[in-house]
A protein has these predicted regions:
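Helix-loop interface residues and adjacent transmembrane-helix termini in multi-pass membrane transporters
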Residues: 13, 85, 154-155, 260
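Hydrophobic alpha-helical transmembrane segments
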Residues: 1-71, 112, 203-213, 218, ...
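Residue-level recognition of pore/gate-forming positions within transmembrane alpha-helices
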Residues: 25-29, 98-99, 166-170, 222, ...
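Helix-loop-helix units of permease transmembrane domains in multi-pass membrane transporters
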Residues: 68-100
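Secretory targeting signals
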Residues: 29-36, 40-56, 98-165, 173-184
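Transmembrane helix segments
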Residues: 158-255
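Alpha-helical transmembrane segments of polytopic membrane proteins
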Residues: 51-55, 133-140, 186-196, 215-218, ...
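Residues that define the loop-to-transmembrane-helix transition and helix capping
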Residues: 19, 89, 158-159, 264
Length: 290
């Protein structure tokens, strides 16, 4: 894993991509920091700077992660990785940690800005709140990186990986607005969960190479969903809302910086990170055995 980690970091800064992305993030953060925190004397770095620059991640993260596995597949060097005496998890974590280190560079600069505010008179409580917001911001970025790495593992084209990453993060960014549009009843919720059941059934059938198991899985899910629709439709509606809330990747950070410091927010980002790393590892494991 160490060798993969070093190679990934080295390759990012061997060309211009690592420097350009870091400078891009620093420039975006510095603009808000100078204009709001220094210009108006505002000590809340989390809300006035970090939260207002989350939209930058919609472009930064996909460009950062697009090469992670797509380039390996294009050059066929992924075959060397998959046949090397290292586990799939070591490959995934080596690349993931390397990207997290690159993302940590602008975050370290953000920490310096927080210390500047402390030197200019920000209270100890405000400084701790700013550092907590920075930690949450970093974990949110790591979750987005995990999503980008997963999407990159699905294709050998970097452009497709980047576009898919932008689309996925843009959907998550706009989900609060979309959620307010989908004040749907139980019928729409039933349709959504039926579609999810169909996808899961296909995956189960492919993983086990059993068409019968896939059909039985889908039939069982349909029976359960129909029973809930007829007997307790409110559960479907509540679950529908919960699913949409879970897709709002940036909303927990907004709530976190609005004086709602919750451990559940940090756990949410860690869970999203582990989930997509697991998806990536499973995909690579399947390709290794094929």
């Amino acid at each position: 894993m160490t060798a993969i980690f070093k190679r990934e970091v080295r390759s990012s800064f061997h060309g211009m991509i690592g420097y350009v992305l870091t400078a891009f993030m620093l420039a975006a953060t510095a603009i808000y920091f100078v204009a709001l925190n220094l210009g108006y004397g505002l000590t809340d770095f989390g809300y006035y700077t970090l939260y207002r620059t989350t939209f930058v991640l919609l472009l930064y993260i996909p460009v950062l992660t697009m090469r992670s596995f797509a380039e390996e597949r294009r050059t066929r060097t992924d075959q060397l990785l998959l046949t090397s005496p290292v586990s799939v998890w070591e490959i995934v974590l080596g690349k993931f940690f390397a990207l997290c280190v690159i993302f940590a560079l602008p975050c370290l600069a953000d920490a310096v800005m927080i210390l500047v505010l402390a030197a200019l008179g920000a209270t100890g409580t405000a400084t701790l709140a700013n550092l907590a917001a920075l930690l949450c911001y970093y974990l949110m970025g790591c979750a987005a990186i995990a999503i980008g790495v997963f999407l990159s593992s699905l294709t050998e084209n970097q452009i497709i990986a980047a576009v898919a990453g932008v689309a996925a993060l843009l959907l998550a960014y706009m989900m609060p607005s979309l959620r307010s549009m989908f004040t749907a009843g139980s019928a729409v919720a039933l349709a959504l969960f039926t579609a999810i059941a169909a996808v899961l059934s296909v995956v189960a059938g492919l993983r086990t190479r059993s068409f019968t198991l896939g059909c039985l899985t889908f039939a069982g899910c349909c029976v359960v969903l129909t029973a809930l629709f007829l007997l307790q439709s409110s559960w479907l509606t509540e679950a529908f809302s919960a699913v949409l809330s879970g897709l709002c990747l940036f909303t927990p950070f907004e709530e976190f910086v609005n004086n709602s410091f919750s451990i559940s927010t940090l756990v949410y980002y860690l869970t999203v990170t582990m989930l997509f790393l697991f998806f990536t590892a499973q995909g690579l494991e399947k390709r290794r055995w094929n």
